[in-house]
């Protein structure tokens, strides 16, 4: 897996065991950040990756100009891969080993990205625990109850949807 744009363009990111995680495909990452770029200024912005896995989404955010990234990962083996990926790029960001639904930082984020492992059916719960933010991005394959959220944009890539919301 490689970072697709920005200061780390082309740099390799190690993916954990694919039986446990499903890293976001490069074409979907590119589309996500291209859409996001039309919505906010990345410079000085903050990005929360709730179910970080390898960390590719947060690393893409840093590479493209986000100043602050917080990545949360529950699985200890995957967290080690996440740490190593950040270290390999010399990035010092906030990495939290814990359950995203219980370890949510209570601070403002410009962007919150939610893609639970194996689409674990926790979207509604994740949406209920997030704090203030400008944009929420969901990557999902199933219908999600978005009551209480404003739909900004939704795009489909194969069987996956990228849904951009405002709280």
How would you label these PLM feature ranges?
Residues 1-167:
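Class I S-adenosyl-L-methionine-dependent methyltransferase catalytic core
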């Amino acid at each position: 897996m490689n970072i697709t744009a920005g200061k780390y363009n082309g740099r390799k990111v190690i993916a954990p065991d694919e039986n446990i995680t499903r890293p976001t495909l490069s074409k979907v990452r590119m589309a996500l950040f291209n859409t996001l770029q039309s919505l906010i200024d990345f410079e000085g912005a903050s990005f929360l990756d709730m179910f970080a896995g390898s960390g590719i989404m947060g690393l893409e955010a840093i590479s493209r100009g986000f100043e602050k990234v917080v990545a949360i990962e529950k699985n200890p083996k995957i967290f080690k891969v996440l740490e190593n990926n950040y270290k390999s790029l010399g990035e010092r960001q906030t990495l939290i080993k814990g359950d995203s639904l219980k370890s949510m930082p209570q601070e403002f984020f410009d962007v919150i990205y939610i893609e639970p492992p194996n689409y674990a059916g926790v979207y509604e719960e994740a949406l209920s625990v997030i704090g203030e933010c400008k944009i929420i991005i969901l990557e999902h394959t199933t219908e999600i109850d978005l009551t209480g959220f404003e739909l900004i944009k939704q795009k489909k890539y194969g069987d996956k949807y990228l849904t951009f919301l405002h709280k």
